[in-house]
């Protein structure tokens, strides 16, 4: 068997074992594709054993707000209680996803970093003035929705959150816990 094929089979075995232990790993940018994969895994676990805990491990630089909120909404719809564990990085929409756990179940590893900021529009936007105005209003609505998520998750005031996300705000796991984004820091798998 060629080495590449053997590695692919090994990866399949590892992925199956992790899914069977109700662990979902989100270790990539938030895209339509990565969101669809996460949603399929969430629903597989929900349909095979509803109400049983799921651990959602996040190491993501963020990405699409719409794709991220698709995952968020599905997590909120299932009956299985979800624990989030940030390892490495949860930035931008990745940080939002880290907040979708049940209360008291938002964790990070000791060297994890969290970055929060306001949404942005990538690339170049062209069009008529009216179209640009529509885009501007939509991104402000998205910003308000993200502020609401951070306010609810942290207990901070909307004014504090709006100031915090005005620019990229980088935090260590300890700083994120003090800010209210995390409930604890994991030093062992046994802490789950």
Curated annotation (Swiss-Prot):
It comes from the Bacteria. HAMAP family: ClpP. One of its GO terms (molecular function) is ATP-dependent peptidase activity. The keyword Endoplasmic reticulum does not apply. It catalyses: Hydrolysis of proteins to small peptides in the presence of ATP and magnesium. alpha-casein is the usual test substrate. In the absence of ATP, only oligopeptides shorter than five residues are hydrolyzed (such as succinyl-Leu-Tyr-|-NHMec, and Leu-Tyr-Leu-|-Tyr-Trp, in which cleavage of the -Tyr-|-Leu- and -Tyr-|-Trp bonds also occurs). InterPro entries: ClpP, ClpP/crotonase-like_dom_sf, ClpP/TepA, ClpP_His_AS. Cleaves peptides in various proteins in a process that requires ATP hydrolysis. Has a chymotrypsin-like activity. Plays a major role in the degradation of misfolded proteins. Fourteen ClpP subunits assemble into 2 heptameric rings which stack back to back to give a disk-like structure with a central cavity, resembling the structure of eukaryotic proteasomes. One of its GO terms (cellular component) is endopeptidase Clp complex. One of its GO terms (biological process) is protein quality control for misfolded or incompletely synthesized proteins. The gene is clpP1. It is an enzyme of class 3 (hydrolase). The keyword Protein biosynthesis does not apply. The active site is at residues 92, 117. CDD domains: S14_ClpP_2. Its main location: cytoplasm. Signal peptide: none annotated. Its EC number is 3.4.21.92. Keywords: Cytoplasm, Hydrolase, Protease, Serine protease. Pfam families: CLP_protease (PF00574). Belongs to the peptidase S14 family. It is found in: Cytoplasm. This is ATP-dependent Clp protease proteolytic subunit 1.
């Amino acid at each position: 068997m060629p080495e590449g094929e053997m590695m692919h089979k090994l990866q399949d075995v590892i992925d199956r074992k992790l899914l069977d232990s109700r662990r979902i790993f989100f270790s990539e940018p938030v895209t339509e594709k990565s969101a669809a994969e996460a949603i399929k895994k969430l629903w597989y676990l929900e349909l095979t054993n509803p109400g049983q805990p799921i651990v959602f491990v996040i190491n993501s630089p963020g990405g699409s707000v719409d794709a991220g909120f698709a995952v968020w909404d599905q997590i909120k719809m299932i009956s299985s209680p979800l624990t989030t564990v940030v390892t490495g990085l949860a930035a931008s929409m990745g940080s939002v996803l880290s907040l979708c756990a049940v209360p008291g179940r938002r964790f990070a590893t000791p060297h994890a970093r969290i970055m929060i900021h306001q949404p942005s529009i990538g690339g170049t936007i062209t069009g008529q003035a009216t179209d640009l105005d529509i885009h501007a209003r939509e991104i402000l609505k998205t910003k308000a929705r993200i502020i609401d998520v951070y306010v609810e998750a942290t207990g901070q005031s909307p004014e504090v959150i709006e100031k915090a996300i005005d620019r990229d705000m980088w935090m260590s796991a300890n700083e994120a816990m003090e800010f209210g984004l995390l409930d604890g820091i994991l030093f062992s798998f046994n802490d789950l």
